[in-house]
């Protein structure tokens, strides 16, 4: 039996870098963010059409992107059922993650 190596996060790797990788290391999530940056606040159905990502898959990614903080949503989770929800890219958080990535790679800029 082959033992898979354990994924190890180096001690000097900040948690924000993991969030950066979760977004920019996934084509679907990158496509969602790109769509929202170009199109502005959008509903799930519009994001699905614009990115060609299936609605169930899109829902999973939107949830994760919201948890990471790169999406702003106009309604809190408890008020969303049966309502149209608009998602928008959080440019400030995206910039924070970009800066964390650059800081990790290049040190003090």
Q: What spans do the regions from the language model cover?
A:
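Short helix-coil-helix linker/hinge
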Residues: 22-29
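Amphipathic alpha-helical dimerization/coiled-coil segments
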Residues: 1-17, 34-38, 81, 86-109
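Short, hydrophobic-biased segments on the C-terminal half of alpha helices
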Residues: 62-66
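Key DNA-contact positions within bacterial/archaeal DNA-binding proteins
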Residues: 56
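Beta-hairpin "wing" of winged helix-turn-helix
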Residues: 67-82
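A short acidic, leucine-rich amphipathic alpha-helix
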Residues: 46-49
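Short capping segments at the starts of secondary-structure elements
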Residues: 27, 39-43
